Amino acid sequence: MNRERGITLIALVITIIILLILAGVTISAIFGEEGPIARAQEASFKTEIAKAKEQFDIYVSEKKVLNQEFEIGTLNAGETSLYYNTKPETEIGNIYTVLFNVNKKYVKDFEIIKGEMFYFTQNEREAQWALEMGMKTNPYEIINGVLISSDKNLFLLDEATGTITIPERVKEVGEGTFAGLKGIKRIIIPPTCKRINNSAFNGNDTLEEVLILADGDQGVESIGNYAFKDCIKLKVVSMPNTVRVLGTTVFGNCSSLEKVQLSSRIEVLSNNMFQNCSSLKELLIPNGIREMKGFLLQGAISLINISLPASLEKIDNNCFYDATSSLQNISLDGSNQHFIVKNGMLLSKDEKQIYAVTKGTINGNTFNVPKGITYVGSGTLMPYTNIKKVVLPESVTSIEAGFFPWSVEEIEIHPNNPNYISINKQILSKDKKILYFCYSKELIITLEEGIEEISESALEKCNNAKTINFPTSLKRLKPQSLKGIYNVKNIKLGRNIEEICGEVFLYNFGIQNIEIDSRNPNFIAENAAIYTKDKKKIIAFVNNEATSFKIPEGVKEIKQSAFSCREKLTSIVLPETLTLIENSAFYKCSALPTITIPNSVEKMDGWGIFDDCSALKEIIVDKERGSLNGSPWGCIYGDRAVKWLR
């Protein structure tokens, strides 16, 4: 019967439409915004809004009658939950409990927050109709389940307690959504939220507690890069076993963090995850984790105990970089097949690689690398300032400069070592073509002629040097090869340089100028910047004291890390000829407040172009919205920082 009635109504509507058309009424008049169809939709919608308002008022009145202590400001309701201050523990409910007589088509789009009812819609007509009925809409910015970066999201902050409760309709906390916002002390994330994106809470310097809830297997599955970076008051993090992925530097610089409960479903602990977590004293790595990535614990100077599981298969060589000064105990599951702890050292099972050295292992001022060791990892001895001498055995085949402590005065290499020699406090390859490490404390350092390559961090511990004379034979500067050397202001490179990139100058905060021999066929240096010979690509800008720089017209590409770590720059002007900006181009330009991307740019290659630019709150793009992929390109403030002009 119902089916027949439905068919009859449809036939009637079709008949009316045909008659209207025959009478000369246009299709647009029938179906347009002012047509009868739209008016019928409006009337139906407004009827449901009116019913919702009435039922909400009745529900609130009933609660007040039942208990005079009921506070309307505590009433919250969504698709799966209902809460108010006098709610009995036995009561189960949700938004449908409140709006039981409203068309279910609409009920799911209502939400009660702090005693106010709102309607959520991306339909502009519905939003207007709701407002005409006195119904508030969209109190926070959500698009397709993603809570996006917007100042409107402060509505979710309970100013009395400093608590933000993420609403149930939120499936993802978007990139930079709450980054840098003040007054947040506690965050509650419901099981309905599946993802916390990059920099979501970056720089919340009042945040003390993060509560990530789960309901069985339902809950947050991934937490993005830098999500809680620079939350300097965050003390405790407890995550459910729903979490499978943790991004790089997720807790970086959380200097108050004392305890972390990790999910057992995570397989990889990402780079820099606990970087500079200087209050972290104990870390239990749950079984299930297979890999610990580079610089995972860098600067975790208070770490005393760490427990490693049977499942662990790989540890990056610099995982414990500058993190062992307080380390007293490394506990390793006895069934682990890949590592052993011996004489206070964490070693590979075959005893060929050192990963970490505990505090009690260091006696006296000499450290003898055990015989049989082939690889010495970065940062292993860095915290131990009492070490003056390091002895390397014949077996060592791979050296990283970061292995050695700042205090080292002598490195003795076994005369039968086939790979390395030591000359004038410089560790070189046997053929003298590669410089691996220089530890001279002289004011003027002259590198050996014949050197063709300088390795990563090779000069980092030449912290007294004011002048470094580079050999004319030099061909290649590897990434971070000029890291450190804070007192060297000017660099002169010869005509044979054929490999240099912006990453060479990462974490160098001293250089102010660079000169390259005019006969060099590959590069040219002007005004503290390095370009390809045709000046179409800028490789690096090196002046650490500069506050502004204008890239000359004609430059088409900004290469990777070109402006990285230029922390005093407050203005960078890009040319109208620019077409490409590569990843990390402006990494750690921490004083830069704004930048304009010209219309000529065709590609911004990488999510981390503005990574760690803590002051960057405005990216002006002289193009149509969405015409460049990757927005906001690593800016911690998310899309609220991006202004499209067209």
PLM features per residue range, with description:
Residues 35-69:
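Membrane-proximal N-terminal amphipathic helix
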Residues 38-52, 118-140, 640-646:
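Intrinsically disordered, low-complexity repeat and linker tracts
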Residues 102, 113-114, 150, 348-351, ...:
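Short acidic-glycine loop/turn motifs at beta-strand connectors
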Residues 29, 33-34:
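Membrane-interface elements of multi-pass transporters and channels
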Residues 174-177, 197-200, 224-227, 247-252, ...:
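Consensus positions within tandem repeat domains that build extended binding/scaffold surfaces
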Residues 4-28:
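N-terminal single-pass transmembrane signal-anchor helix
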Residues 130-147, 158-172, 181-195, 204-222, ...:
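Structural signature of tandem-repeat unit edges
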Residues 61, 65-132:
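Periplasmic/extracellular, small/polar-rich flexible segments of pilin-like filament-forming proteins
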